[in-house]
Structure formats: structure tokens, C-alpha cells
């Protein structure tokens, strides 16, 4: 197994060399607004009524492109911080094995892989590989938390307007990343022009990303093209596993994008096949987003496990290192800091 992984990494070094951070925006404003609107409009009747009002639907739609509004040169630190949230290069991420659910474990695994395979260290920097499923999970959990608060306030006959505003913001914010996850070029090192061996002669220019997700959508795709292609409501089991499966299906369509582009499918009015494919991708994003909204609402009713600090493992009366009670107080020794090259 270790030998196989070494071969895979060697091939990636040959094929991809230095991998840059994608700078293209997902779907463009129009595509993101379509995804968010359709998800909000298709909520079932047992979802909270305030989420199904025309004003709420309009707000969720408006917020679809919100994270792209944070990618302005006027706010360079914000832009740099959240740019990797829009994509994940699965060919690189999968080199660490099964993706852990925790963002920081993922970062540590990428760092360890870079130490083991120095030639890949630059390409395996976390901001180059991307955090797409991590930001999605984290915003989904924010939404679920706010929905739990809404349930509690409603049960106590208290004012729910503030938490309703929070829920709509999280719902709109979540929609952006779920939408990005339906765009194949947001899941691959082949994000903006084919790199490495290219026996099929796919484009290597750096315009395919915007040509597909923005220019073509703006000119040729409308809500009415997408809505009929949405799938029926699906019950989400484990949201992390289901979302990764969704990303992997999206990734399986990367070459299809390049094939359509080679056939001039995204030029001007494009081809019927390209229009159908693009509408299907947007519909997949809207369907998954709706399903995640419903899952957050259903799971917000589940009891929250209580944390009992006294239940943490103890040693000589103190919390064991590694427990939540101890983590914030752990300080590396000077010797360890020196070994890490941090002095």
C-alpha cells in the first residue's frame, strides 16, 4: 500500500508539477442565485414557515454569491483567508487517505504527507489543496445550531426574529459552497486548463473555467431550465459522508467538461448537450442544498450530548493531556519548540 501511494505521488509530481491556487469564482453570480433560489423554493411544508416566505427566499437567493463578494482586492486578507474554501483538488487530497472530518486533522495529514514526500510538499500545502468540504460542514453545523436555538425559543414563546435572521444568513452562506461543489472544475487540479499528459487534446488555456461557469451560464441558462431537473427530496444520513459522495460524483464529470469544451459546447449559444449538462449540474447543487437544509432542521431536534468535565480522563487530579479541559493549557517545552524550529 505504501509503495502504491508512493507511485501515485510520483506520477502526480510528473503530471502536475507546481499546482497553483484556483482564483476563479464558482458558477458566477447568476448560477449561485439560481441554486439558492431553487433550494429555498422547494423546501417541504414541514420546514419552518418563515423560511418559505417570499422575502426569505429572496434573501437566500441574494446570499448565494456572498462568499465571492468577499474575494475583493479591497479586502486582501479576507480574500486570501477564504479563497481555499471554494475548492478541493481531490487528486491531491486523496493522497492522505480517507479525509478526516476535522479541518485541523486534515491540515496535519497534508503536512505529514509533505514531509514524507518532499517533492510534493508545495502542492500539498492546505491552501493549495483546498477546504471545500470542511467549510461546507462547518457552515451546515452553524445552520443546525441556529435551528436548534429557534426550536428552543419557539418552545418558550420567546422572540425568534433574531435567530430567524441568523438561519437565513447561514442558509444563504451554505448555498454558495454546496453550489461550488456541483461544479466539476472546483474538485480537481484540472481546474482551469488541462495539465499533465493530454492525449485527447483538451484545452490548456486558462479561460475554460470562467467560460463554462460564468459566461455560458449568463448567456444560456435560466431558472426554468434548471428547476425541472431537480431530484426528489432525499434523506441525508451522515451529512459528511453524503456530501463527500456528492463531491466525488461531481469530480467524475471533470473530463466531460473538457470534452464539451473541445466540441465548442460553451462557445456562444453552445450546444444542446452542453446546456443540458450545465443545467443538470446547477440542479444537482440546488437539490443537495435543499436536502441539507432539511437535514439540518431534522437533526436540530436531536438532544445535545452534555459535556461533563469531571468525566475527562484524569491523572493525579488533573485533566489528561489531549482532553478538551487540558488542550488550552498545554505548552510545549523549550526543547520541543527548538526541535520544531520555532525558536
Where are these regions (language model features)?
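Bacterial N-terminal signal peptides that target proteins for export
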Residues: 1-11
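Bacterial N-terminal signal peptides
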Residues: 9-20
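N-terminal, motif-rich segments that launch catalysis or mediate targeting to/interaction with membranes
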Residues: 24-173, 184-283, 290-343
